[in-house]
Amino acid sequence: MAANQAILDATIRHAVFLEQLKSGEVKKFAPFLKEIDRSIRERLTRADLTDYTVARLERLLNEVDSLLLGIFDRYSEKLNLDLVDIANYEAEFEATSLTRAAPVGVTFDAAVPGAAAIRAAILTNPLSVRGADGGKLLKSFIDGFTATERQRLTGAIRQGFFEGQTNFQIIKNIRGTKALQYNDGILATTNRNAGAIVRTAVQHVATQARMETLKENADVVQSVEWVSTLDSKTTSQCRTLDKRRFKLTEGPRPPIHINCRSTVVAVTRFSALFAKDATRASIGDGGAQQVRAELSYYDWLWQQPAAFQDKAIGPVRAKLFREGGLSIERFAELQLDRNFSPLTLVQMRALEPLAFERAGLLS
């Protein structure tokens, strides 16, 4: 087995482990969510809000916000400690993978960056996420979530007051209903958002810590290759970035979007990235199977049935993919702008009107 095949296999197996670790981290928010629920209910059952003046309401909201701030601060502190631990582990993992991937007869012990360098990397390198969270540092990314959720919860109380709702109705709006397993309340939104933030933060620190190890071994590591998940859930950004290579100090890194599952794999000087018989995992129309490692996402998607293509990238893009007469490479190029943000169909049509015409998509 070629050295880089060993790195690829280890990285993909580790990506699966990382998704499980993310799920475990997400569950750690549950007791804090319960505390938020208890605190709000306890405060809203002391007196009927319909008897409050606006000034008294604002004092109540300040009190509630202070309670929420304390809870979210404690959660953020715990999360940040966990993220540092994860980062240290990921740096060690990458060093071990590099060391084990050395060909027979080659003595190589990968260097591991110091704890201070790892911490600096995860805290001072911005997230590659595009959109509203683009360019944020880890702390402001997490702080933005907690501030938004505090405003959402206090805003629900304020709105309920001005709309003449009873305390019970406000609590119900915040908690949700038992009939829908409390999935229709504001706290359910907070919980979902917490999950997204945690998964994205874990991906960020894992990638940045691994990259720090690769930079520490730049005499062996030439570049990194983006590896996306081959299934119908992969986003347009990750579909297009799949198999793209970047220098160690250039290009985006996972997470490229919220809840990103992509990873990067080291390209070393030991051998070509993939042996000719190398494979990677996929979940296509026929279920889970191994496919040739050199296949990009869109190479793989071309081999799937039309119905699967429609599900994966949407019926309009899929029709353009099949009938627009574009090469797979050109179709992939059309998906993102120069900043790796997704292009709309309107923007794509402006760039390739003839392809849309061939596919019968101009109307």
Enumerate the predicted regions with their spans.
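N-terminal leader/targeting and assembly helices and adjacent pre-domain segments
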Residues: 1-180, 273-363
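Acidic, glycine-rich two-metal-ion catalytic cores of nucleic acid-processing enzymes
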Residues: 171, 181-282
